Structure formats: structure tokens, C-alpha cells
Amino acid sequence: EYGLAQVSMNLTNMHLTSLHRAFESCRKSAEQRGLLVTGSELVGLIPKKALVEAGKYFLQKQNRSTGVSEQEIIHIAVQSLGLNSLQPFDPQTRIIEYMLEENNKELVSMSLEKFVRETSSESPAPGGGSVSAYAGALGAALGCMVANLTAHKKGYENQLDFFSGIAEQAQQKINELLFLVDEDTRAFNSILEALRMPKQTVEEKKARKKALRSANKKAIEVPYQTMKVAASCLDFILQMVEKGNPNSVSDAGVGALCIETAVRGAGLNVHINSAGLEDEEKKKYYLEKASKLESKTIQTVGKIIDNVKMKMSVHP
């Protein structure tokens, strides 16, 4: 059809023979015969993991950091495998997980401007909880950026694996915090749904009370999770301040401040939502945990910012 030789394969076990391994084997075999692999074609759907592994393989082969977004990794795989060579390859319609994925990313799929406008509207959601989670994601992203910038900077070649590992860790935190952006709004909406439940009969009152109890508990657990995930980012942000590219130290500092905003903002949501929790023991548990985590975060960020200022005075 295309006037080219073709190698057809059915990969039945990608744990044994990965997509990129099969492609590379064909490429090497063709090279031995003086031929050039011009691209490849995928028939049907493919698991996301196969393309992610391929993308990371080619990034490592290029001595590039693998701590980039999933979308970028898949883009690298598609380009390196030549999956666009015969016809456009659309990951949204060719990757199994993307085809099955429910449309639950209502806020994180918005543009920056639309998210801001939506927040500014008269609707109570998204509110402080979602904004706190997003601030945390931005903080993690800045730490990730410093890691990736340093990984490819002259003089840091021998530390590629270290900075790439930090960037991968940061990407995972970004994913968790972006999920919590929408999860916080879903938690708030579950309270509204419970409040709208009928309460005429005894059975209806019991069902409504049970739903409210569950919704209130979730409305505390979600921002508390935001606090924990955001606070955990300070470890790698501190490492980027100490070991990263000195020219990017201010970016790491801004990342730390974003994390503090995320933790303290989510902490406010834990406090205000705890008012609806009837279980006094659980209320005390969450309030104490949140207070300790907030205090530790403020202290850690203070040290990071002092470190940043010191680095900037040494490297004007």
C-alpha cells in the first residue's frame, strides 16, 4: 500500500517483550541490511504503561530527565516510535486507559483564566480547598522544573539520575495534588447533595443524617490529604535549593511558599469543616494533626527561604 517493506508482530506479553524493545530489534536488524526504519503503525488500542515505558526508554537514551509529565513522555514515545508516520496517532483514542477514563477532571482541565473566573463567580465551589491544592501543585511543579533544568545543565552531567529521580517524584506529587483540586470540590458538593435530601419521614431523616455524616467526614479528609501531600514536597524542594542550579534557587523558593500556602489554606478548610463532625474524638484528631503539620511546614519553609536568600547573596 505504501511501497515499503513491513514487519508485522503481535505482542502478546509486553512484560516479556516491550513495545520499544520490539521496535529497536527491528531497527537494528534493518540497519544490518542497509535499510532504514521510517516509522511504525499501531493497530487497535494499547495500554498506557507500554507507551510510558517506551517514552522513558527513549528519554534515557537521549540522556534526558524522565521526570516530565505523562503527556510529554507519551509524546516522546509516539515521536520516537514513528507512530505518526502513516497517519496521525491520537493518544486519547488509542490508549485504553484514556478511552475508559471518566470525565472527572472538571477543574484541572480548565484553562488558567477559566479556572480563575470560575473561582471568582458567585458559586461557592471551587473554593479555598481546591485553590490550596492547586497552589500545592504549582509548588511541586516549580521544584520539578528546577530538577529538570539542573539535570541538563553543563557541569551536572554525572548527576542526571539523581535530578531525574527528583523530577519523577515531583511529577507524582503534582498528579496527586491536581486530583485533589477536583476532589475537594466533589467533597463540598457531596455536602450540598446531602442537605438537599428529603427529611419528611423517620427513614428519610436517618438516611439524610447518615449521608451528611459521611460527607462531612470526607470534607475534612480531603483537605487534610492536601496538607500531607503538599508538605511532603518540601523534602525535594529543599534539596533543589541546596543542590540545584543556583540560577533557579528563587524558583525553588517560590515553590516552597506555594507549598506553605497550600498547607495553611487546606488547614483552614480542615478547621471550618470540622464543625460539622459529630464525633468529638475524630474532630480532635484531625485538628491536632492539622495544627502540628501546619506548624512544621511554616518552620521548614522559613528555613528554606533563609537558605534561598543566602544562596542569592552568594550568587547575585
PLM feature spans:
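Polytopic transmembrane helical bundles with strong interfacial aromatic enrichment
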Residues: 102-117, 225, 232, 273
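Non-transmembrane, amphipathic alpha-helical segments
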Residues: 107, 123-134, 158, 162, ...
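Conserved phosphate/anionic-ligand binding catalytic regions in large, soluble enzymes, centered on
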Residues: 11-13, 119-146, 247-266
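A structural signal for well-ordered alpha-helices, especially hydrophobic packing surfaces
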Residues: 146, 174-181, 188, 220-227, ...
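Amphipathic alpha-helical interface segments
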Residues: 184-257, 273
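Long, contiguous binding/interaction regions
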Residues: 1-113, 121, 207, 211-214
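A structural-propensity feature for long, helix-poor, extended segments
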Residues: 152-198, 293-294, 299-301
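Flexible, glycine/charged-enriched surface loops at secondary-structure junctions
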Residues: 1-2, 32-46, 50, 157-158, ...
